[in-house]
């Protein structure tokens, strides 16, 4: 799936991912390739991304062995047409 993580200041990540684990307001959930359309709010926690290449342009993500993580305070996520957009604070 195409993944885009955006903050008010800049685009944190843009690229392909196999799966994304998110801290939803009502509990953690995972989004996989070709997931059904969804819109959800996010609470403070960690976004875990699997199946990514190291992206030297992203100084906010922590990379290790094809995985990445990002601590957030809150956000909103939308999955539509195999593109996951995460707006974070």
Question: Where do the model's predicted regions map?
Answer:
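Compact, glycine-rich, soluble single-domain proteins
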Residues: 2-89
């Amino acid at each position: 799936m195409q993944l885009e993580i955006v903050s008010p200041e800049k685009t944190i990540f843009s690229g392909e991912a196999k799966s994304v684990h998110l801290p939803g307001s009502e509990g953690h959930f995972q989004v996989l390739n070709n997931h059904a359309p969804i819109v959800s709010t996010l609470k403070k926690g960690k976004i875990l991304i699997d199946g990514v290449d190291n992206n030297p342009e992203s100084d906010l993500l922590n990379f290790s062995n094809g995985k990445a993580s990002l601590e957030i305070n809150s956000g909103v996520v939308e999955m539509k047409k195999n593109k996951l957009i995460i707006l974070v604070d």
